[in-house]
């Protein structure tokens, strides 16, 4: 019985039950837990037709792989909790 309990405890410690990343997400710029498998935070910015009035559009979120920046977009990724604050 003791051996079985020890094995269960060791298994739980080794599995770590899948830590998930915490990133800021838009539209509310809220710190949220990312879905399993999405271990990167990203920040994407671009200009829309109102750029000269209110600045660049900012998108924050979680991702499994860093999104490829399209023309006239800036994209950065990072791998620590809340490493993508609103610029």
UniProtKB/Swiss-Prot annotation:
Gene Ontology MF terms in the entry: acetylcholine receptor inhibitor activity; ion channel regulator activity; toxin activity
The record's similarity note reads: Belongs to the three-finger toxin family. Long-chain subfamily. Type II alpha-neurotoxin sub-subfamily.
Where does it live in the cell?
Secreted
Pfam families in the record: Toxin_cobra-type
Which protein, by its recorded name, is this?
A: Long neurotoxin LlLong
**What task does this protein carry out?**
Binds with high affinity to muscular (alpha-1/CHRNA1) and neuronal (alpha-7/CHRNA7) nicotinic acetylcholine receptor (nAChR) and inhibits acetylcholine from binding to the receptor, thereby impairing neuromuscular and neuronal transmission.
Q: In which tissues is it expressed?
A: Expressed by the venom gland.
Q: Where does the secretion signal sit in this chain?
A: 1-20
Q: List the disulfide bonds.
A: 23-41, 34-62, 47-51, 66-77, 78-83
GO cellular component annotations of the record: extracellular region
Q: Give the organism the record lists.
A: Laticauda laticaudata (Blue-ringed sea krait)
Instruction: Kindly give the PROSITE patterns that the UniProt entry links to this protein.
Output: SNAKE_TOXIN
């Amino acid at each position: 019985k003791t051996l079985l309990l020890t094995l269960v405890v060791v298994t739980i410690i080794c599995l770590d039950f899948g830590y998930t990343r915490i990133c800021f997400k838009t539209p509310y710029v809220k710190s949220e837990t990312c879905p399993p498998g999405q271990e990167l935070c990203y920040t994407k910015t671009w200009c829309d037709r109102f750029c000269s009035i209110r600045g660049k559009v900012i998108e924050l979120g979680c991702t499994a792989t860093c999104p490829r920046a399209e023309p006239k977009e800036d994209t950065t990724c990072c791998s620590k909790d809340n490493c993508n604050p609103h610029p």
